[in-house]
């Protein structure tokens, strides 16, 4: 197996979970940016949320243009951090279904590994209810594909996934989180314009489609934009409070230093 383990930063993991919980009707996807060390351990530092051109309940696809754009973003991060950043994997959600990859997922993963043997796949299973406690659960897994011994098909191999705690939210992950509402809005606009451009629709149908479009945007504002804004405001308040505490500590230390002098 090419990869021994995967370490994902806590703030990047948070963006993946938030993106996965943004919709329970279709699967969502994104790309992982990071580096691979000499011990064949993949370190994921940030993620890129991808815009879906075709919404499907049980399938996601990454276009060559999106992969190229992600590579460009990885190069930009490499210049900023001075580390060899690249696209090291992909993630997608499994709403209401098992966390294990489907045959399509395994074949897709095998295709990516043909380009990079260190490429990994992450799956987030969400909107799953525990039958005993009646509480929601989020399950996640990391995998690669290998050729089956007595078959031409591929099979999955689970890769250990470790979430690395991170006390702060780095700028690159914060930008990805803030980008989520805009991407979801663009997806709704694309779907509405595609349907609205059909010439055979009557006036009542167009009015209905417009109402559905407005309803979906309001739902996104309530479920995504509102909580995200509240979270950012709470985070800002915490940072300001912490800054005041550090300033007070600094002044106290300066006074003690002055007394010693």
UniProtKB/Swiss-Prot annotation:
Q: How is the cofactor bound?
A: Binds 1 zinc ion per subunit.
Drop me one GO molecular function for this one.
metal ion binding
> Which cofactors?
Zn(2+)
Q: Where is the MPN domain?
A: 6-149
Q: Which SMART domains match?
A: JAB_MPN
Instruction: State where Zn(2+) binds.
Output: 92, 94, 105
- Motif position, JAMM motif: 92-105
Q: Where in the cell?
A: Nucleus; Cytoplasm; Cytoplasm, Cytoskeleton, Spindle pole
Q: If you read the UniProt record, what top EC class would you report for this enzyme, in one word? A: hydrolase
Q: Which GO terms describe its cellular component?
A: BRCA1-A complex; BRISC complex; cytoplasm; nucleus; spindle pole
Domain of life, per lineage:
Eukaryota
PANTHER family on file: EUKARYOTIC TRANSLATION INITIATION FACTOR 3 -RELATED
Tell me the protein family, please.
Belongs to the peptidase M67A family. BRCC36 subfamily.
Q: What is this protein called?
A: Lys-63-specific deubiquitinase BRCC36
Organism for this UniProt entry:
Xenopus tropicalis
């Amino acid at each position: 197996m090419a990869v021994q383990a995967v370490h994902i930063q806590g703030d990047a993991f948070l963006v993946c979970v938030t993106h996965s919980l943004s919709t329970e009707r279709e699967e969502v996807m994104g790309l992982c940016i990071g580096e691979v060390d000499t011990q064949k351990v993949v370190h994921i530092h940030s993620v890129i949320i991808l815009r879906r051109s075709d919404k499907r309940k049980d399938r996601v696809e990454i276009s060559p243009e999106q992969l190229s754009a992600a590579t460009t973003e990885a190069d930009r991060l490499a210049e900023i951090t001075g580390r060899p950043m690249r696209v090291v994997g992909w993630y997608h959600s499994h709403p209401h279904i098992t966390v294990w990859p489907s045959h399509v997922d395994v074949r897709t993963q095998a295709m990516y590994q043909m380009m990079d043997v260190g490429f990994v796949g992450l799956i987030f299973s969400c909107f799953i209810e525990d039958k005993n406690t009646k509480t929601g659960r989020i399950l996640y897994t990391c995998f690669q594909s290998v050729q089956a011994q007595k078959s031409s098909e591929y099979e999955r191999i689970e890769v250990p996934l470790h979430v690395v705690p991170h006390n702060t939210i780095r700028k690159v992950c914060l930008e990805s989180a803030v980008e989520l509402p805009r991407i979801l809005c663009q997806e709704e606009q694309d779907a509405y314009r595609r349907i609205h451009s059909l010439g055979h629709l009557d006036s009542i149908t167009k009015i209905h489609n417009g109402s559905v479009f407005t309803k979906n945007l309001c739902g996104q504002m309530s479920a995504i934009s509102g909580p995200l804004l509240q979270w950012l405001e709470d985070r800002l308040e915490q940072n300001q409070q912490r800054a005041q505490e550090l300033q007070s500590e600094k002044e106290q230390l300066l006074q003690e230093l002055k007394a010693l002098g």
